[in-house]
Amino acid sequence: TPGLTITGPCEMMVFEGLPGSAFDCWKDILRPDQRLTKACELLRRFVPWEAELCQKVKLTDEQATLQGSYTPVVKKPTFRLSYGKPVLGLGDSILLNDPIGGQGANNACQSATFFLNKIKEHESRLFTEEWMQETFETYWKQSAQWATKWTNLMLKPSKSFVSLLRAASHQPNTANWLANGFDIPRKILTEMDLNE
């Protein structure tokens, strides 16, 4: 992935690992140079054709690496401010999916649009905590649950989904259809037949 750092343009690598997998190895690797060494080892082991492209890779600076973990969660969508008024959260403040599914910005945009439309429909009535909870539940059923299912499918792909990914690697129409599924996971998931 192309990037820009304080020292200029660069190419970035992202490694994600399920707990207990070979890629779940970063917790005790603290120094950036050690992280780069481990990244190159993983490339050589799992994707040697990519490792060939990284033979001369080097860090741009001492802050060139970032490590962390991510716990997907659906939070309570409402919160009470210190003076008692309820507020409705949206996007990552209430719904966290693993980044592998590419749904963070998608959920933020879709929830903002959905909630705005519901606010307009509600007109001048009170925006109670109950209304906010119901609005979120409707959003979950119509949109957000599909983003979560899509992300979970990426994390633990079925054999059928792996076959679909393989097909997309050499069939442009399938690749385009699959890539467009990131925008509207509900549409693509209802179109896919991934029965094992």
Question: Model-found features: residue ranges?
Answer:
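FAD-binding beta-loop-beta segment adjacent to the flavin cofactor pocket
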Residues: Q67-L95, P99
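Short, solvent-exposed loop/turn segments at secondary-structure boundaries
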Residues: W26-D28, I100-G104
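Conserved FAD/dinucleotide-binding core of flavoprotein oxidoreductases
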Residues: T1-G68
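C-terminal helical "tail/cap" subdomain of flavin- and related membrane-associated enzymes
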Residues: T60-A64, R80, G101-Q103, L116-E196
